[in-house]
Every structure is written in structure tokens, then in C-alpha cells.
């Protein structure tokens, strides 16, 4: 079925093929990718768009000696297939299977681990400098696209690289399509300058003015050429010190091979601009690349199923999105901000209903936080919808620009806790630890869908920095009350009364704790707030129980349990404690329920840990 692909187990095998067979290989690779991802799910449209580029890179460069650094990793399935992992593609994003992103431990061809965007240029530059310093003759290549060029980190690296005499190649895979449509001045610059009215007017204007004097036609031609050069995409990158080449067709493997061979012999920083189509070769993905960016299992003949197949429980992301729209109707000061995650953060409806109050700042988490701070200074009430793992990228701004000034910015932290198939790069394992130590912050963790809605409302009422963290996927199925009411700040609630053991559960761990408590006859408190903690409730439970257990879907170190321990110590209560949470390690990808079980954070694991502690 795949006569060429089946004989390629490494790039060395690929380089044995005559160039005339590379287009056939691209076709086979595309067919294999459709078949494979349709069975496992995963990133799809970006991978279809990077096939010819991947073939050309491994054909021209001596990988793994030469370094390929992929940005984000959404487009690296073809790379994995060509580097000896074809037979394991059926394990993609499953526990103990292939990771969905490049991972150094997985293959020597994965030169740099990624998952977050805009890191490739800086990493590849570091490798280029290392090669030069150590006297190693090798090339370093950064492949960046999927909206990652909108992030400031990419331009920091470009600025540094252009001033250094290193053999670095940056390839911009320009498919004009990130997860959400690219926004901002840079995308406008790349996408519109060549066809824009301003460029056309400049060209026409210079011709008209200089056309008055016929002998100056030659000068006019040169001026027009100069105007064209000044306003083409390459100008920006040449100003950074790169030799700009392109744009070229990213789906013409012959052109790619010829161009890369020429560039390989050049010295200094090079910038190759290629144009590709996201979803190339699979019409449904070409027509709707957002829908097919990341997919579940599907029938290749019919594509992804339409609709959701019935009512079912809403995901927490939807609970947030509905609350945001409802709250916007009640308070005209509300504005919504997302760093290029409109769909993932549940803001599609909000953008449609309130386009003048919706701000997608592109992949710019640092800017998103400071931007929100500026809005809050002058009377708006910004809500920053962001994944827990991505807020890490704006941590200094969170402290310096928001919390230090005690500004009313609300952070809606999606994907808090483990995220399953996306693995450790996307897990929200640290937010309780890095938020609770910041003065002026109020941190909340709802236990179900209705509590999520009410705590979102509660957070919005405060005129100080707040964060509400909630997990990926669906909750336990609590009935959502449309009427919103602010919950008492820093107060938890006892959900079950038992004896001997009191479990202080936070957020997503409340319901597993309740299930464990049935077997233990333990007390369970839904703490709701990580900061401020309900010190009075902790005191009462400590005075009436023999063991205090804290449970959270966050690392134990510095998390909510640590806060409870600090509170007990401050009150002088020497009650035995047990802190349960994520380990001091990175939890790998896999089914979320399986991962929680392996971490001892399902009902059975919680019960087991408590019984072992009681047994001494």
C-alpha cells in the first residue's frame, strides 16, 4: 500500500531515493497520515501541510547531525514517521506511546522538546552557537509557523540571531492559519503588503509623478523597484540581519530541495519563507482547518462527525463561555482577552455577541496580562481566558503589572490539572503553587459546573486580582443554576460529615474524595478557595478529627495542601496531616482517568493512601 514509505526507517533511507520519487513519497505519507490520525486522533491539519517540507529537510540535511528544531510541534507527525517511528504511530498520544510533540527522550532526531510556541529560533540559535564554539561543522534549522511568529520571543531571538555570525536557517511555514486566525500587525504585514492599497498607491503615485518627465522613466523604474522592495515581507527580516529568500511553494518538493541545497552552502543567518496550505490533500481539512486542527477519531471517508450527538454534560470551557456572555450583558465594563485560543478557551460565542469587547492578542501571553492591567487601570473589568500552562509565560507581568498594583484583572484558568493526551507541556500542574504565593491574589477552585459558574461570578465582583481554575473536559454533572450569586470569600463548605479523618478537597478532587470517604466514613470539605483559605473551617476539622488529608490536582510542593499545613502550624495545631496531589515529576501523556489513577488521585487511590497512613 505504501511501497516507498514502508522501506524508509530513517532519513538515511530517504536520502537513497532518487528525487523523482519524492512526490510519490509525499503522496504515500499523506495517505498514511490520514489513515493513522483518523484512528488515534491528534493534530491533523498542520501535519498535512508540512509533508513536503519535512521530506525536503531530511533529504537535504544530514539529520540528526544537522539540527532541526520544530516550533510548537503541531506539524511533526511526518517527521516522526520518517525518523523510525512509523510502526508506533498507532500509539500516538496514548500512555507509554508516542508523544504528540517532539521529545528528546523519544528520538535523537527530536533535538529540542516543545509544546509551547515560539521557542524554535532561540533554541536553534543556541545550537548554532554551540557548534561554532566547539568547532563542529553542522547546520541548525528552526521551522516556525502556525501563528508562532506573532510572539515576542520569536522576535527577541531574531534580533539576537541577526547580529551573530552563525549558520542558522529560519524557515517560516506560512499557512496563514494558526489555531485561531492570526491577528495583529505582523500578520497584516506578511499577508497584505504585496496586495495592499498602500503599496499600489505608492507604485501608481511614483509612476505618475515621475511620468511627467519622459527621460526619467528609467529612474521611475528604479524607484518602483525600491518601493516594492521596501514593502515586501522580506524587508522586515533583512532588517534583522537575515538573508531573506522567498516566498516559495511549500508543496513543491523539487523547488524545496533545490532551494535548501543552495541555502545549505550559505554562511550566516538565512531566512526562508515558504507558503503552504493547512490540511493540504484532505479537502475537509483544507476547507475548515480550525475544525481539523486537532481531531478525535474519525472516518476518513466522511470526516469528523457534525454536532455533539446529544445534550450530555457541558465541558467546563462551555460553562465559562456561557458565564462570560451572561456576565457581559450585566456589566458593560467586562472585556474578554485571549492569547490566540478563542476556540480552546470557549470565547467563540462571546466574540460573536460582543465583537467590540473581544480581544485576541495573538500568542503573546506577557502582553495579554499587561494589556489587561492597562484596561483595569482606566475602568474596565478584563477577563483573561488562558490555559493554566500558558499563564506561566506571563508570570512576571502577573506579579509586576497586575498584582503589585492590585488591579481588578480576572484570570479564567482552563486546563488546570492533568490534560491527558497533550502531556506535560500542556498540563496545568503548577498554578496553585505559583498563584497562592502572590500578594493580593484570590484563588478559587470549583468542584463542579454550577460552583464554577458561581465562583466566576464571585471573582468578577472583586476589585482585586483573581483566578478561577478549572479542569479540561466535563465535570460531575451538577445542575447549573442560571441565577448567579457571590459566594462568601475564603469560605469552604462541608459536603459530608464523618469521623476520624477529615479530607480537605480542592476543585476537581472533591468528588473523588467524596467517593473515597464513603468507604472510610470520613468528613469531606469542599474548600473552594485556595487563597484565602478557610482557616476557621480548618481549625474546627483539626480539633475534631485525628487526621487531616488534603487533596488537589496540583503538585504537592507549594500547593493548596502546603497552605493548609502552614495554617495549622500558625494556629499551633499539631494534628497529623497527609498531603495528596501530583508528584514532584512530569506526568506523561495518556488517558486522563488512567493518569489520575497512576497518581493515586482517583477514589481508590485516595482511599488507599489514607488507609496506609492510618495503618502507620
From Swiss-Prot:
UniProt-listed Enzyme Commission number(s): 2.2.1.7
Top enzyme category: transferase
GO cellular component, as recorded: cytosol
Keyword Lipid biosynthesis: no
Swiss-Prot/TrEMBL catalytic activity: D-glyceraldehyde 3-phosphate + pyruvate + H(+) = 1-deoxy-D-xylulose 5-phosphate + CO2
NCBIfam families: dxs, PRK05444.2-2
One Pfam family matching this protein: Transketolase_C
Residues annotated to bind Mg(2+): 146, 175
Subunit structure: Homodimer.
CDD domains registered for this protein in UniProt: TPP_DXS, TPP_PYR_DXS_TK_like
Family that this chain belongs to: Belongs to the transketolase family. DXPS subfamily.
InterPro entries tied to this protein: Dxylulose-5-P_synthase, THDP-binding, Transketo_C/PFOR_II, Transketolase-like_Pyr-bd, Transketolase_BS, Transketolase_C, Transketolase_CS
Cofactors demanded by this protein: Mg(2+); thiamine diphosphate
Pathway(s) where this gene product acts: Metabolic intermediate biosynthesis; 1-deoxy-D-xylulose 5-phosphate biosynthesis; 1-deoxy-D-xylulose 5-phosphate from D-glyceraldehyde 3-phosphate and pyruvate: step 1/1
UniProt binding sites for thiamine diphosphate: 74, 115-117, 147-148, 175, 282, 365
Single GO molecular function: 1-deoxy-D-xylulose-5-phosphate synthase activity
Cofactor: binding comment: Binds 1 Mg(2+) ion per subunit.
SUPFAM superfamilies recorded: Thiamin diphosphate-binding fold (THDP-binding), TK C-terminal domain-like
Protein name: 1-deoxy-D-xylulose-5-phosphate synthase
Biological processes annotated in GO: 1-deoxy-D-xylulose 5-phosphate biosynthetic process; isopentenyl diphosphate biosynthetic process, methylerythritol 4-phosphate pathway; terpenoid biosynthetic process; thiamine biosynthetic process
Keywords tagged on the record: Isoprene biosynthesis, Magnesium, Metal-binding, Thiamine biosynthesis, Thiamine pyrophosphate, Transferase
Function: Catalyzes the acyloin condensation reaction between C atoms 2 and 3 of pyruvate and glyceraldehyde 3-phosphate to yield 1-deoxy-D-xylulose-5-phosphate (DXP).
Amino acid at each position: 500500500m505504501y511501497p516507498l514509505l514502508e522501506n524508509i526507517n530513517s532519513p538515511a533511507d530517504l536520502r537513497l531515493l532518487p528525487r523523482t520519487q519524492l512526490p510519490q513519497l509525499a503522496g504515500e505519507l499523506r495517505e498514511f497520515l490520514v489513515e493513522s490520525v483518523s484512528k488515534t486522533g491528534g493534530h491533523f491539519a498542520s501535519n498535512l501541510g508540512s509533508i513536503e517540507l519535512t521530506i525536503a529537510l531530511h533529504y537535504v540535511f544530514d539529520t540528526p547531525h544537522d539540527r532541526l528544531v520544530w516550533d510548537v510541534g503541531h506539524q511533526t507527525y511526518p517527521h516522526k514517521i520518517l525518523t523510525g517511528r512509523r510502526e508506533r504511530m498507532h500509539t500516538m498520544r496514548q500512555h507509554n506511546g508516542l508523544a504528540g510533540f517532539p521529545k528528546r527522550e523519544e528520538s535523537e532526531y527530536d533535538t529540542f522538546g516543545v509544546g509551547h510556541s515560539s521557542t524554535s529560533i532561540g533554541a536553534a540559535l543556541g545550537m548554532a552557537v554551540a557548534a561554532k564554539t566547539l568547532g563542529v561543522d553542522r547546520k541548525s534549522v528552526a521551522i516556525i509557523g502556525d501563528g508562532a511568529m506573532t510572539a515576542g520571543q520569536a522576535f527577541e531571538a531574531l534580533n539576537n540571531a541577526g547580529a551573530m555570525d552563525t549558520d542558522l536557517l529560519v524557515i517560516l511555514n506560512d499557512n496563514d492559519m494558526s489555531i485561531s486566525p492570526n491577528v495583529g500587525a505582523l500578520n497584516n504585514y506578511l499577508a497584505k503588503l504585496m496586495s495592499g492599497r498602500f503599496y499600489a498607491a505608492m507604485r501608481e503615485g511614483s509612476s505618475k509623478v515621475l511620468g511627467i518627465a519622459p527621460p526619467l522613466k528609467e529612474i521611475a523604474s528604479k524607484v518602483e523597484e525600491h518601493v516594492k522592495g521596501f514593502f515586501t515581507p522580506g524587508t522586515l527580516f533583512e532588517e534583522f540581519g537575515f538573508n531573506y529568500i522567498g516566498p516559495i511553494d511549500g508543496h513543491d518538493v523539487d523547488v524545496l530541495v533545490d532551494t535548501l541545497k543552495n541555502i545549505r552552502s550559505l554562511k550566516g543567518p538565512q531566512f526562508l519563507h515558504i507558503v503552504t496550505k493547512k490540511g493540504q490533500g484532505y479537502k475537509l481539512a483544507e476547507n475548515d482547518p480550525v475544525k481539523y486542527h486537532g481531531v478525535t477519531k474519525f472516518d476518513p471517508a466522511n470526516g469528523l462527525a457534525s454536532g455533539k450527538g446529544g445534550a450530555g454534560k457541558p465541558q467546563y470551557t462551555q460553562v465559562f463561555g456561557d458565564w462570560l456572555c451572561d456576565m457581559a450583558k450585566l456589566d458593560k465594563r467586562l472585556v474578554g482577552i485571549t492569547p490566540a485560543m478563542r476556540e480552546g478557551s470557549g470565547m467563540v460565542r462571546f466574540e460573536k455577541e460582543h465583537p467590540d469587547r473581544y480581544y485576541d492578542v495573538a500568542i503573546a501571553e506577557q502582553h495579554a496580562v499587561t494589556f489587561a492591567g492597562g484596561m483595569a487601570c482606566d475602568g474596565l473589568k478584563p477577563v483573561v481566558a488562558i490555559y493554566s500552562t500558558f499563564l506561566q509565560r506571563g508570570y512576571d507581568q502577573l506579579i509586576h503589572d497586575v498584582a503589585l498594583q492590585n488591579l481588578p484583572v480576572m484570570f479564567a484558568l482552563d486546563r488546570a490539572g492533568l490534560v491527558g493526551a497533550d502531556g506535560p507541556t500542556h498540563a496545568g500542574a503548577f498554578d496553585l503553587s505559583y498563584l497562592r504565593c502572590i500578594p493580593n491574589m484570590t484563588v478559587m477552585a470549583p468542584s463542579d459546573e454550577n460552583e464554577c459558574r458561581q465562583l466566576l461570578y464571585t471573582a468578577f465582583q472583586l476589585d482585586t486580582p483573581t483566578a478561577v481554575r478549572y479542569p479540561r473536559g466535563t465535570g460531575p454533572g451538577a445542575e447549573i443554576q442560571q441565577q448567579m450569586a457571590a459566594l462568601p470569600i475564603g469560605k469552604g463548605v462541608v459536603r459530608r460529615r464523618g469521623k476520624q479523618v477529615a479530607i480537605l478537597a480542592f476543585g476537581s478532587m472533591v468528588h473523588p474524595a467524596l467517593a473515597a470517604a464513603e468507604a472510610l466514613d470520613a468528613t469531606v470539605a469542599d474548600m473552594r478557595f485556595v487563597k484565602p483559605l478557610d482557616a476557621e473551617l480548618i481549625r474546627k476539622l483539626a480539633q475534631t478529627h485525628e487526621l487531616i488529608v488534603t487533596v488537589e490536582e496540583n503538585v504537592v510542593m507549594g500547593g493548596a495542601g502546603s497552605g493548609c499545613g502552614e495554617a495549622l502550624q500558625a494556629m499551633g495545631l499539631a494534628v497529623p496531616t497527609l498531603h495528596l496531589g501530583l508528584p514532584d515529576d512530569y506526568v506523561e501523556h495518556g488517558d486522563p482517568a488512567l493518569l489520575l489513577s497512576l497518581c493515586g488521585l482517583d477514589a481508590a487511590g485516595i482511599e488507599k493512601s489514607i488507609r496506609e497512613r492510618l495503618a502507620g
